[in-house]
A protein has these predicted regions:
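Hydrophobic alpha-helical connector segments
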Residues: 63, 77-112, 129
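Short, leucine-enriched amphipathic alpha-helices that occur as contiguous helical runs
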Residues: 11, 15-23
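N-terminal intrinsically disordered/low-complexity leader segments
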Residues: 1-13, 204-214
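Short linear capping/connector segments at secondary-structure termini
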Residues: 112-119
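Helix-turn-helix
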Residues: 2, 17, 25-63, 67
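Amphipathic alpha-helical packing segments from all-alpha helical-bundle domains
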Residues: 121-144, 152-164
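Hydrophobic/aromatic-rich alpha-helical bundle segments in the mid-to-C-terminal region
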Residues: 144-206
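Amphipathic alpha-helical hairpins
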Residues: 42-45, 60, 71, 75-91, ...
Length: 214
């Protein structure tokens, strides 16, 4: 191929610019209709290099989401540290809310992924794995190690809270995502009640939340 391409100095930087390009294209077309060559051209990266480093558009999109997940968790952690002593439940809510805030400018991309996942089981599975990894990190950051069978069930329970809240978030144009926050709080309370009845969450809870598991 003959084109004026700028090859970044490192593979990491190449991945970043390719991921940004794929993410931008995803706003306007389904992921399975985005060609890796089009991503490379938009990123001004050699097509062969893009194929060698990334391999697929799906890989680039998931890598971009992983970057955004890290950003949201890092910001949530900073806010939690500034807030002082708060309960595990409040920390989890803060972590989830930061995700919704971080992705708020990218609802078009999330909508495209949701639509594509319905007809592409491989994408749906990878998105679910990515979500559960994010939830697990949120729990660990909040003081819940999420180990063992009960830990796995807590991850899935909070993932259910997340998915239910996401339906509201997609349409939420309220100031400060107030509708999303309200739904998130309601769903977390409901999940906590179910979890305690099923012995998934710790029943030993104090008013200050230090023994909360959700």
């Amino acid at each position: 191929m003959s084109q004026d391409s700028t090859i970044p100095n490192s593979n990491y930087h190449t991945m970043v610019v390719l991921g940004d390009a794929a993410w931008t294209l995803l706003a306007n077309q389904p992921i399975d209709q985005i060609d890796i060559d089009a991503v490379a051209d938009r990123a001004c990266v050699d097509r062969g290099l893009a194929g060698a480093i990334a391999g697929s558009v799906q890989y680039l999109v998931l890598a971009k989401m992983s970057e955004l997940d890290r950003q949201s968790l890092t910001e949530a952690y900073g806010d939690i540290q500034d807030a002082g002593e708060v309960s595990v439940r409040e920390k989890i809510i803060e972590g989830l809310l930061h995700w919704f805030e971080t992705y708020a400018p990218y609802r078009l991309q999330i909508d495209q992924l949701n639509r594509s996942a319905r007809s592409h089981p491989d994408l749906a599975l990878r998105l679910l794995v990515s979500l559960e990894a994010f939830i697990r990190r949120t729990l660990v950051m909040s003081g819940d190690p999420a180990f063992g069978l009960r830990g796995m069930m807590r991850v899935k329970g909070v993932a259910g809270v997340f998915l239910a809240t996401a339906c509201i978030w997609m349409k939420d144009d309220s100031n400060g995502l107030a509708a999303t926050m309200k739904m998130l709080d309601q769903r977390m309370l409901q999940a906590e009640e179910w979890g305690i009845s099923l012995r998934v969450f710790d029943v030993r809870r104090s008013h200050d939340g230090l023994n909360d598991r959700v």
